[in-house]
Design a protein with these regions (language model features):
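Short, compositionally biased P/S/T/A/G/V-rich stretches that sit at domain boundaries
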Residues: 22-41
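C-terminal catalytic histidine-bearing segment of alpha/beta-hydrolase fold enzymes
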Residues: 366, 419, 423-465
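Alpha/beta-hydrolase fold nucleophile elbow
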Residues: 325-336
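Cap/lid segment of the alpha/beta-hydrolase catalytic domain
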Residues: 242-311, 367-375
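The feature captures the conserved acid-bearing segment of alpha/beta-hydrolase catalytic domains
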Residues: 368-432
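N-terminal cap/lid segment of alpha/beta-hydrolase-fold proteins
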Residues: 34-40, 177-227
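Short beta-strand elements
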Residues: 86-88, 114-159
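Hydrolase active-site cap/lid region
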Residues: 269-273, 336, 340-388, 441, ...
Length: 465
């Protein structure tokens, strides 16, 4: 999730293409993982068979030189690591789990030196295409690995109890917005590449004491002729060291788009300087911790960093609904990781979102993260320390309040993503009311990595399955 983590997925795909001219034994290689049935349908105590198939090895693997490092873990703190010979042939691992939850299997190829193999870029970096491929390769994970697993009786997974005054708390918070009229504080047209749209840098008034909503608003030129359009809110992933929010190339002539940052930062179009950016970076930290991670700040739901973020999301939707160019019916929200969390907030905050597309949703059932850390069933540092106040921001609790009229899509849930663990995503899915929803579980997918497409990778549940 750190700095442009969502771009790693695209980088991985580009890097794979770059490997095709590789000469090294494993510079093209990756490991495909498949289960003997739909990985979300195992029952307690049932054997789970995961087949690991090495792909795109360039030659024969020398006998006795390489090993496969395997780690089996689960949501309950069970953990085991061992090695087996790596021959390039498929490997079947069998396990089970006696209660609802997920089993995780990690596999890394070790080289003759006993260290994890690191793939090397072997393309031609002297051409523009080659340089682009090399840059993508540098951003991608370079190990030869698999990270995935399977779920057991996932339909039984239920979240930690929500705060008893959840709705009353948010009624009070939203009343703070009601005291401040929806209005642009600043709106400046900025250059962009699509002549059929206009793009504006905007600052929108938020609640008193809260930084404004800032970002970029694109409106189709055809609106000048009286045409009306759907409106979309786009939100961002996490960056503990944010850079300037710059205009992107996403302006579309088919819909209105408001692309906002998490912080209400000053934009370059409004004269933002390096000093302004550094001031923001320092101000969003708390007690030496990156924003939103300070348990002292998070002890009170009103002082939690997420409080202002939620209010900015709701105000952004309110602003979209005031635009004369909006068609008055289609209101969308989308984002990934932290943006996926904000998308769930958007869908559940009462502004009438009609479609929400949330990928690799962060902060689902955060209480279980505390258990995971205590049992050392964790990898990565992306679990916010639990306080009871975090229950007011947990994606699972917001999901319960999504109207059934809203089409809610969890567009990617990685079975190897332990930044946003599968257990939390399953609880999110179970908490969304009704049947107007879908989720795509992706085998072998980490937070910033999706393996190449193969049969047995994707499993869609809900509408359109």
């Amino acid at each position: 999730m750190k700095t442009s983590i969502m771009s790693y997925v695209a980088a991985s795909a580009l890097a794979l293409a770059a490997f095709r001219s590789a000469a090294g034994l494993l510079d093209n290689a990756w490991i495909k993982g498949t289960t003997d049935k739909d990985p979300l349908t195992y029952r307690a105590g049932e054997e789970i068979a995961i087949t690991l198939t090495p792909m795109d090895i360039d030659g024969e693997v020398p006998a006795g030189e390489y090993a496969l490092e395997l780690t089996r873990s689960d949501d309950y703190g069970n953990f085991k690591t061992w090695t087996e010979p790596f021959t390039g042939a498929p490997h079947v691992y069998r396990t089970s789990l006696d209660k609802p939850g997920f089993v995780r299997l990690e596999a890394y190829v070790l080289g003759p030196d006993g260290k994890r193999v690191t793939k090397k870029f072997t393309g031609d970096a002297t051409t523009p295409e080659g340089k682009k491929a090399m840059n993508a390769f540098e951003k991608a994970k370079k190990a030869v690995f698999f990270d995935g697993g399977a779920g057991v009786e996932v339909e039984k997974l239920a979240p930690y109890a929500e705060p008893k005054d959840f709705d009353a708390f948010w009624t009070r918070q939203f009343a703070r917005l009601d005291k401040v009229p929806v209005a642009f504080l600043e709106k400046v047209e900025v250059p962009q590449r699509n002549p059929r749209t206009r793009l504006y840098a905007v600052s929108i008034a938020c609640a008193e004491g809260i930084r404004p909503v800032t970002g970029y608003l694109s409106i189709p030129v055809a609106a000048d002729e009286g045409k009306k359009f759907p409106a979309r809110l786009e939100t961002h992933g996490y960056s503990g060291n944010p850079g300037f929010h710059m205009p992107g190339g996403w302006a579309r002539e088919t819909e209105i788009v408001l692309n906002i940052n998490a912080h209400g930062m000053k934009l370059p179009a409004f004269g933002a300087t390096d000093d302004d950016l550094e001031e923001l970076r320092q101000s969003i930290k708390s007690n030496g911790r990156s924003y939103a991670f300070d348990p002292v700040q998070n002890a009170d739901p009103e002082t939690a960093y997420f409080n202002g973020m939620v209010l900015r999301v709701k105000r952004a939707l309110q602003c979209l609904k005031t635009l004369k160019e909006w068609n008055g019916k289609d209101l969308y929200a989308n984002g990934g990781s932290q943006g996926g969390l904000q998308t769930i907030w958007a869908a559940g905050c009462g502004e009438g979102v009609t479609r929400a597309d949330s990928a690799i949703t962060w902060c689902c059932d955060m209480h279980s993260h505390a258990d995971r850390l205590a049992k050392k069933a964790s990898s990565g540092g992306w679990y916010i320390p639990w306080t009871e106040a975090m229950g007011y921001y947990d994606a699972v609790n917001w999901a319960k309040r999504i109207p059934t009229a809203c089409r809610t899509n969890i567009t990617r849930a990685g079975l190897g993503d332990y930044c946003c663990p599968p257990m939390g995503l399953a609880k999110l899915w179970n908490s969304i009311p009704g049947s107007n929803k879908s989720i795509v579980w992706v085998q072998g997918s980490e937070h910033g990595y999706v393996p190449p497409q193969y049969e047995g990778r994707d499993f869609k549940k809900g509408i359109g399955k």
